[in-house]
Amino acid sequence: MQKARIRLSGISPKDLDGVCNQVKSIAERTGVNISGPVPLPTKKLVVPTRKSPSGDGTATWDHWEMRVHKRLIDIAADERALRQLMRIQVPKDINIEIVLEG
């Protein structure tokens, strides 16, 4: 039987866990096997910027950071489960990647 690997990523861990819970509830309702969600390492993106607007004065820096959280879910590729997965309401800052593996 085919497997669907679902990779979720986003900057809000609260929204990410909400989508993971929706996927788990779909798997329980349809009765398919599920493994996960597996938390993957968080990627930290750091952008240093100068504090002074003109460039004069001492070189003081601000460091802005964005964290990208990721989750991985493997689910049996049942047709009913995949149709319901396509209808999940997903927040704008969450990215979903679904790959079918044989």
UniProtKB/Swiss-Prot annotation:
Pfam families given in the database record: Ribosomal_S10 (PF00338)
Gene3D superfamilies (alphabetical): Ribosomal protein S10 domain
The keyword Membrane belongs to this UniProt entry's keyword annotation: no
Listed PROSITE patterns: RIBOSOMAL_S10 (PS00361)
Gene Ontology annotations for the cellular component aspect, listed alphabetically: cytosolic small ribosomal subunit
InterPro entries assigned to the protein according to its UniProt record, in alphabetical order: Ribosomal_uS10, Ribosomal_uS10_CS, Ribosomal_uS10_dom, Ribosomal_uS10_dom_sf, Ribosomal_uS10_euk/arc
Annotated function: Involved in the binding of tRNA to the ribosomes.
Subunit structure: Part of the 30S ribosomal subunit.
Name of encoding gene: rps10
GO biological process, alphabetically ordered: translation
Family, similarity comment: Belongs to the universal ribosomal protein uS10 family.
Domain of life where this protein originates: Archaea
Protein name as catalogued: Small ribosomal subunit protein uS10
Keywords: Ribonucleoprotein, Ribosomal protein
PANTHER family assigned: 30S RIBOSOMAL PROTEIN S10 FAMILY MEMBER (PTHR11700)
